[in-house]
């Protein structure tokens, strides 16, 4: 028999405070002046008697009961004791499984919030030791942090006792679980996770969070994707927060004041005493998705991370795309990076599984989650060769598709490349130079001659070694092999270890018998069947100046001149250091040979990534990233062989370090004029605030480089001004719409390293993009 004995007390309220192996209950006396306000903590694994003004009551094990206030209580048997006013004692063992609270269509004014504390089911929410929360929302606020759902202790002195799910105005999603920081503070977040605006309208996002005691794990989802996971040694949840008394939408009540105010609409919120599956949460949050992922974590590339978009519509109507498949997080080279490729046969609606046309196999290609903590996020793969920064280009006369990328030898990137071309001049011809692995680091006594035969340059005689079309090494006609490397983390230390897997030995690999000079190279392949098959690898950068540290591609697309004296010429943007920042290579024989031209005499080493458009007479304009906080324009009237001085593009803002941009010609007329379309972030503080500008081409009546001017008439915002926007690539789709493949995050921010599925593909009609520039 259970008993509770008390005489003439106004209210007794019981609530779960914490759960270890057994629940602990608080018994609150909120009474008349005679008894005062007192709180008693009774551990239910012992029968206790506490005195209240010399009166006593017992709380016994397994008391989970509703208590109703009544005068002159007498001893009752059983598990329910009646008082006259309802209060609740709850442990997780009595919380019903499944959905325990749901609300829909709640409009919230920022700073007001919406209190759920008295809603049916809220008493269960306050005692959860596991669960799932799903919330859809549309924010109208620009507050930096906005709580969507919070559960906590709102009384004075308890400001750090709460759990909340929040968003930021930069697109971050996160959660905090706190019971004063010295006792408990778990945080989990993912930047660049949600959006604010899509096609000129504020939009809903759907977020899910689950707390799983079985795996000691927390997960966050949004818009169809698993964003982040936190594994803990000691699992905690709502029931571990002292004195929970508040459930709130649209803010977190701290010391009686609403903090982190959200303004907008909560479309729906559901709280479960149940751990829903990842698949179910991806499906439910996928109700709000915007754009597509052509390349995504877990696809056929086996990469978790993608950067550097390239997008091109072919003359046949096929749309092709390329990107870096980055296996070592989102780091640049040096790293393990290949070039992924995909194509669409229906105008960009659906995309084929990606393939890898440019790939080194010295390091395994695998899905690995790169750490994002303050130490691990900076760790890079040290020994791998890599391809980086793709460029796509079609020769419309031959229908040949080219793909270019920078080729980096093992352990090399632009930052640590050696000055020099990587070639030597022998009898008036340039040959790639090689070092025998046992020779000194500066001794390059060998070269690759005709038919891939390796010569000893000291004797000028052929050796028994040669390379094939992909620079793999052979001896006496037999392919040489080396062991492939794997990479795994032990804490924040990256271990690069030799495996038992044999791969073809390549002169770009660190374990090759012959090694190329450790600088940057320009790689090219071509396809005559729209990317179904590819040619052998061609290294085309023998023209790299000897005083250049690096000569690399301006990623995006190349250009073929379609009219005028230089009709048919192929041209690809480059940039360098220590010689000229901006440069180009061009071909007049359909890509058989290439010539290099420097477009300036600057030597500050700024990243002058450029893209090219054609004027109505066949002259060219190139728009480029600079290191001076502006986007620049240069003009060529001789097919790209020489270029004008830089002119600043007005009213476009960029950071001091700049960002790659995309610019294309539009085939039709806009407002009766030929036009170009440009994509870039528009901010001087970060890679944020993506814009698409439409520029009308005006004939000034002048001649030479001043013949055409650009009237930047329209400007479309891809998302709100705080949302990340980095590298991008535009194309005109077969139906006349504009396709955009872009990095939807701030790729410069160290806080946004190693994010999955940030390469987004979206389409727009010209009418959607025609938003007049506001003065």
Task: Name each region found by the language model.
Residues 203-219:
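Localized edge beta-strand/strand-to-loop motifs within extracellular or lumenal beta-rich domains
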Residues 80, 110-176, 273-280:
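Extracellular glycan-recognition modules
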Residues 230-265:
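Flexible glycan-contacting loops in extracellular carbohydrate-active proteins
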Residues 61, 69-71, 81-83, 132-141, ...:
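Short hydrophobic/aromatic patches on beta-strands that form ligand-binding or substrate-lining surfaces
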Residues 176-206:
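Short, aromatic/His-centered strand-loop micro-motif at the edge of beta-sheets
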Residues 45-56, 66-68, 265-291:
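Extended recognition patches within non-cytosolic domains
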Residues 75-128:
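Low-complexity, glycine/proline/serine-rich flexible segments
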Residues 274, 280-775:
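Asp-box/BNR beta-propeller blade signature and adjacent active/binding-site loops
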């Amino acid at each position: 028999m259970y008993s509770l004995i008390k005489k003439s007390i106004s209210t007794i309220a019981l609530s779960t405070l914490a759960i270890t192996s057994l629940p602990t209950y608080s018994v609150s006396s909120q009474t008349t002046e005679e008894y005062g306000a007192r709180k008693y903590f009774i551990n239910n694994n012992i029968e206790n008697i506490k005195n209240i003004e010399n009166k006593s009551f017992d709380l016994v094990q397994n008391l989970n009961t509703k208590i109703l206030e009544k005068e002159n209580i007498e001893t009752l048997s059983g598990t329910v004791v009646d008082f006259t006013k309802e209060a609740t004692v709850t442990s997780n063992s009595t919380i019903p499984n499944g959905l325990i609270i749901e609300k829909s269509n709640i409009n919230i004014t920022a700073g007001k919030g919406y209190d759920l504390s008295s809603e049916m089911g809220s008493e269960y929410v306050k005692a959860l030791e596991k669960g799932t929360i799903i919330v859809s929302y549309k924010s109208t606020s620009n507050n930096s942090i906005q709580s969507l759902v919070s559960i906590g202790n709102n009384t004075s002195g308890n400001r750090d006792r709460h759990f909340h799910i929040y968003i930021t105005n930069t697109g971050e999603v996160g959660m905090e679980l706190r019971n004063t920081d010295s006792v408990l503070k778990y945080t989990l977040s993912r930047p660049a996770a949600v959006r604010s605006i899509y096609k000129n309208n504020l939009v809903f996002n759907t977020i899910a969070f689950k707390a799983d005691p079985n795996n000691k794990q927390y997960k966050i989802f949004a818009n169809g994707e698993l964003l982040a996971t936190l594994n803990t040694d000691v699992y905690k949840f709502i029931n571990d927060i002292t004195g929970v008394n508040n459930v709130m939408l649209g803010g977190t009540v701290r010391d009686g004041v609403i903090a982190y105010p959200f303004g907008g609409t909560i479309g729906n919120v559901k709280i479960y005493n149940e751990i829903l599956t990842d698949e179910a949460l991806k499906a439910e949050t996928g109700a709000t998705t915007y754009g597509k992922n052509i390349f995504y974590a877990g696809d056929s590339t086996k990469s978790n991370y993608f950067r550097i978009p390239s997008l091109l519509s072919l003359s046949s109507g096929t749309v092709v795309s390329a990107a870096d498949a980055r296996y070592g997080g989102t780091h640049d080279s040096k790293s393990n990076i290949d070039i992924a490729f995909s194509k669409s046969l229906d105008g960009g609606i659906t995309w084929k599984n990606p393939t890898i046309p440019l790939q080194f196999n010295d390091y395994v290609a695998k899905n690995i989650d790169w750490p994002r903590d303050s130490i691990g996020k900076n760790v890079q793969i040290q020994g791998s060769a890599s391809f980086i920064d793709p460029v796509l280009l079609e020769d419309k006369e031959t229908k040949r598709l080219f793909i270019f990328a920078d080729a980096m030898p093992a352990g090399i990137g632009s930052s640590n490349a050696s000055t020099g071309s990587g070639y030597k001049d022998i009898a008036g011809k340039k040959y790639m130079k090689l070092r025998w692995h046992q020779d000194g680091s500066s001794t390059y006594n060998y070269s690759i001659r005709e038919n891939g035969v390796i010569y000893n340059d000291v004797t000028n005689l052929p050796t028994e070694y040669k390379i094939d079309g992909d620079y793999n090494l052979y001896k006496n006609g037999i392919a040489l092999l080396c062991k492939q490397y794997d990479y795994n983390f032990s804490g924040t230390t990256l271990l690069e270890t030799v495996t038992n897997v044999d791969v073809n030995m390549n002169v770009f690999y660190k374990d090759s018998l012959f090694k190329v000079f450790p600088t940057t190279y320009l790689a090219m392949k071509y396809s005559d069947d729209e990317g179904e098959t590819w040619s052998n690898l061609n290294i085309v950068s023998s023209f790299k100046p000897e005083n250049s540290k690096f000569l690399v591609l301006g990623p995006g697309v190349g250009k073929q001149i379609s009219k005028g004296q230089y009709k048919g010429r192929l041209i690809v943007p480059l940039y360098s250091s220590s010689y000229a920042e901006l440069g180009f290579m061009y071909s007049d024989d359909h890509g058989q040979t290439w010539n290099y031209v420097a477009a300036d005499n600057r030597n500050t080493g700024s990243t002058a990534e450029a893209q090219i458009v054609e004027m109505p007479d066949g002259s060219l304009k190139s728009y480029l990233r600079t290191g001076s906080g502006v986007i620049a324009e240069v003009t060529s009237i001789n097919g790209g062989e020489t270029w004008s001085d830089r002119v600043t593009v007005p009213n476009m803002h960029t950071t001091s370090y700049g960002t790659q941009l995309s610019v294309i010609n539009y085939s039709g007329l806009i407002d009766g004029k030929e036009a170009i379309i440009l994509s870039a972030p528009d901010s001087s503080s970060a890679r944020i605030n993506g814009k698409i500008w439409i520029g009308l081409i005006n004939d000034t009546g002048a001649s030479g480089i001043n013949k055409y001017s650009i009237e930047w008439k329209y400007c479309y915002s891809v998302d709100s001004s705080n949302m990340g926007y980095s590298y991008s690539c535009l194309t005109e789709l077969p139906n006349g719409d504009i396709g955009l493949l872009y990095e939807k995050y701030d790729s410069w921010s160290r806080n946004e390293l190693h994010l999955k599925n940030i390469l987004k593909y979206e389409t727009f009609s010209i009418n959607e993009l025609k938003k007049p520039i506001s003065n």
